[in-house]
Amino acid sequence: MFYHASPAHCIEVLKPQVSNHGRPLVYLSKKRENALVYLSNAVEKYCRETGFSHAGPWQKWASYGFYEGKLRLDEYYPNAIWDTYKGVSGYIYAAEEVPGGEEQEDIPDAVITSQPVPVLGCEYVPDAYEAILEAEEAGLLLIRRYGELPEAMLAWIDSSIKQEYAEAEDIPTYRHFLKGKFPEIIAGLG
């Protein structure tokens, strides 16, 4: 089975959309729990909540990696997971087959395709945060809370956020998000 997250209801066929890879693709995971993190985009959510207007595609934000075969969410700022996912509802779509599917090399258990994917089933997720905590409790994914991060990781976050901010000169939504969530790091960067 393959899984895809979306805020949209009643999708019968997953259609390729312009992606981070610069071409229309459908992204799916072989693990339902891995799809949960795509129910919310922290940048989009923060901009909407703060009234920052925007038209066009949203910058993606993903603070996860993989550890011992499991997705691991890292909180890059205090309460980031609650902040990003609490109160966000959406749908997890299931597909039995992925026409033209290829393994996505940089994300374990992920599959991409440039072809439409027929939907087999749909699950409503009323609160993405609660679903993520349930998956953590079941041992299906890992969470490293901000207070648990090692000093080396905090230093990496500091450096990475400064670099991301500098490179996002033409992406005002992303800069707005970074300023709002990392004010101490961004202070004085202009």
What are these regions (language model features)?
Residues M1-R23, Y38-N41:
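ADP-ribose/NAD+-binding catalytic cleft of ART/PARP-like enzymes
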Residues K31:
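Short, conserved phosphate/pyrophosphate- and ester-handling motifs at nucleotide-, phospho-/glycolipid
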Residues P24-L28:
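Surface-exposed, glycine/proline- and aromatic-rich loop segments on solvent-exposed faces
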Residues G22, N41-G190:
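Conserved NAD+-utilizing ADP-ribose enzyme module
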